[in-house]
């Protein structure tokens, strides 16, 4: 079974580094264009997460795949936090904190995918990339809470938390031991 790739790459999609800056439906402020379609890159990443997380190798077919990879790895980080939460409210607080926490971007030490991502070419691109990734992180965390928490019990679903130990591409956005 092949891995799933992003279908959202358009010829006029803006790039930051070699990563696509795709439109998203977001309530958070940031540089991402507003999405008008039903499905955006975050929906796609959440939908394909359970299938893609099993792959140790992933062929990058376009720049949108790099965005998909980042979100997939971020979802893994979110699940580590959400499995310890007792309610959706607590999970949303954890996701907000994780979303705004200082994080490395391509080209910085500590970014696990420097071999696949090009660092920003100047200070302005650096700021746009950091703001875009933060916007992705915040919106992904919020949407993931809606998927992970069971509305009846207000507890994390085992059908999501069972993926905590899985590492997509043998990579993690967090430092070793965290």
UniProtKB/Swiss-Prot annotation:
Location of the protein in the cell: Cytoplasm, Cytoskeleton; Cell projection; Nucleus
Record GO biological process: Arp2/3 complex-mediated actin nucleation; regulation of actin filament polymerization
Record's protein name: Actin-related protein 2/3 complex subunit 3-A
Family listed: Belongs to the ARPC3 family.
SUPFAM superfamilies per UniProt: Arp2/3 complex 21 kDa subunit ARPC3
Keywords: Actin-binding, Cell projection, Cytoplasm, Cytoskeleton, Nucleus
GO CC terms in record: Arp2/3 protein complex; cell projection; cytoplasm; nucleus; site of double-strand break
Oligomer and partners: Component of the Arp2/3 complex composed of actr2/arp2, actr3/arp3, arpc1 (arpc1a or arpc1b), arpc2, arpc3, arpc4 and arpc5.
Pfam families on file: P21-Arc
GO molecular function: actin binding
Known function: Component of the Arp2/3 complex, a multiprotein complex that mediates actin polymerization upon stimulation by nucleation-promoting factor (NPF). The Arp2/3 complex mediates the formation of branched actin networks in the cytoplasm, providing the force for cell motility. In addition to its role in the cytoplasmic cytoskeleton, the Arp2/3 complex also promotes actin polymerization in the nucleus, thereby regulating gene transcription and repair of damaged DNA.
């Amino acid at each position: 079974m092949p891995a799933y790739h992003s279908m959202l790459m358009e010829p006029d999609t803006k790039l930051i580094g070699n990563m696509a800056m795709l439109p998203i439906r977001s309530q958070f402020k940031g540089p991402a264009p507003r999405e008008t379609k039903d499905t955006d890159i975050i929906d796609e990443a959440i939908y394909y997460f359970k299938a893609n997380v099993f792959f140790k190798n992933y062929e990058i077919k376009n720049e949108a795949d790099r965005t998909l990879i980042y979100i997939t790895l971020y979802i893994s980080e979110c699940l580590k936090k959400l499995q310890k939460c007792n309610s959706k409210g607590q999970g949303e607080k954890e996701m907000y904190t994780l979303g705004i926490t200082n994080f490395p971007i391509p080209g910085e030490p500590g970014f696990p995918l420097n071999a696949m991502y090009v660092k920003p070419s100047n200070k302005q691109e650096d700021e746009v990339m950091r703001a875009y990734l933060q916007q992705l992180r915040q919106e992904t965390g919020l949407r993931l809470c809606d998927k992970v928490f069971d509305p009846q019990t207000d507890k994390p679903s085992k059908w999501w938390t069972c993926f905590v130990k899985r590492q997509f591409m043998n990579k993690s956005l967090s430092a070793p031991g965290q």
